[in-house]
Amino acid sequence: MNIKEQIINLPKVELHCHLDGSLRPETVLDLCLKENINIPYENPEDFKSSLKISKNCSSLKEYLEKFYFPIRVMQKKENIYRVTMELLEDSKKDGIEYTEIRFAPFQHTEQDLNENDVVEAALEALQDGESKLGIHSNLILCSLRHDPVERSIDLVNLANSYNEGVCAVDLAGNESDFPPELHKEAFDLAYDNGIKITIHAGETGIAENILKSIKLLHADRIGHGIFAYKSEEILQYVIENQVPLEMCPKSNVDTKAVKNYKNHPFKKYFDLGVKVTLNTDNRTVSNVSLVDEYLNLANIFDFGIEEIKTVIRNGISASFATEEFKVNLLKKLD
């Protein structure tokens, strides 16, 4: 077997995958037509291409503009179910056995749905993914930095109302203008209720947001964390406390957080003993699969199959799955 076949066959997990950044382009087009959403392209292929990032993308802000149409079409239960199920199908093709899919429910209440309708539509797909595809999954509910803390508190209460299927809460969005502490009250509430927490931090050059997210917002994991190296103190803290980093190299190259793949700190962190995990972030926007990301580790950073297995082990142990599930998946990997 060649390296790609070996990677496909390994039982993998994904911890950082945004639903609205991972819709199939043909599905977005189909739903736009069904919902009479005006698209600014005469050629359907041009529209589908526009959902993916170009090499000329200059920033995270420009990258996030790609979410406009996916969010527009995710305003009905049947559409949310469909795109969630399709993501599970795409994940299964990648050899993923467990995935945590994240999205911001309040972004999908522009029409007739309330936030519970939104979550339940996605959960129905997760249940069918388990029974029909054999892929285990959970939801992570995202709060958005630019929203007031009261909205984040509502989000935490929403997550707390589900005993199964919702495994954690997250804080995402513009970290340059909205530091973690603005949402401390909400994440204190999550922590007090035993809800797992992951926070986007250190994605856009602000290393101190990593430590703030851990100490003020009780983060169990950090989304991205690429700029930990800017502070020796923060990097050592992450290593000594084995704080898992949900790393998404292709996405970071696309947003110009790093110059190119070789400049990404993934290998440096791996060699230093950071608990790095590998993820796609946004499959469609970044035009990447998890197998692609592991192939990049092999081809660009010379990772062998044992090093790849170590990264997968990191992901399994850092996941918010049950301990029993994690033990069984680790046995399967070994």
From Swiss-Prot:
It catalyses: adenosine + H2O + H(+) = inosine + NH4(+); 2'-deoxyadenosine + H2O + H(+) = 2'-deoxyinosine + NH4(+). It holds the Pfam family A_deaminase. Keywords: Hydrolase, Metal-binding, Nucleotide metabolism, Zinc. Its EC number is 3.5.4.4. The record marks H224 as: Important for catalytic activity. GO terms for molecular function: 2'-deoxyadenosine deaminase activity; adenosine deaminase activity; zinc ion binding. SUPFAM superfamilies: Metallo-dependent hydrolases. One of its GO terms (cellular component) is cytosol. The keyword Cytoplasm does not apply. The keyword rRNA-binding does not apply. The active site is at E203. Zn(2+) binds at H16, H18, H200, D281. It comes from the Bacteria. InterPro entries: A_deaminase, A_deaminase_dom, Ado/ade_deaminase, Metal_Hydrolase. Binds 1 zinc ion per subunit. GO terms for biological process: adenosine catabolic process; hypoxanthine salvage; inosine biosynthetic process; nucleotide metabolic process; purine ribonucleoside monophosphate biosynthetic process. It is an enzyme of class 3 (hydrolase). Substrate binds at H18, D20, G173. Its cofactor is Zn(2+). Catalyzes the hydrolytic deamination of adenosine and 2-deoxyadenosine. NCBIfam families: aden_deam. Belongs to the metallo-dependent hydrolases superfamily. Adenosine and AMP deaminases family. Adenosine deaminase subfamily. HAMAP family: A_deaminase. This is Adenosine deaminase. It comes from Clostridium acetobutylicum (strain ATCC 824 / DSM 792 / JCM 1419 / IAM 19013 / LMG 5710 / NBRC 13948 / NRRL B-527 / VKM B-1787 / 2291 / W).
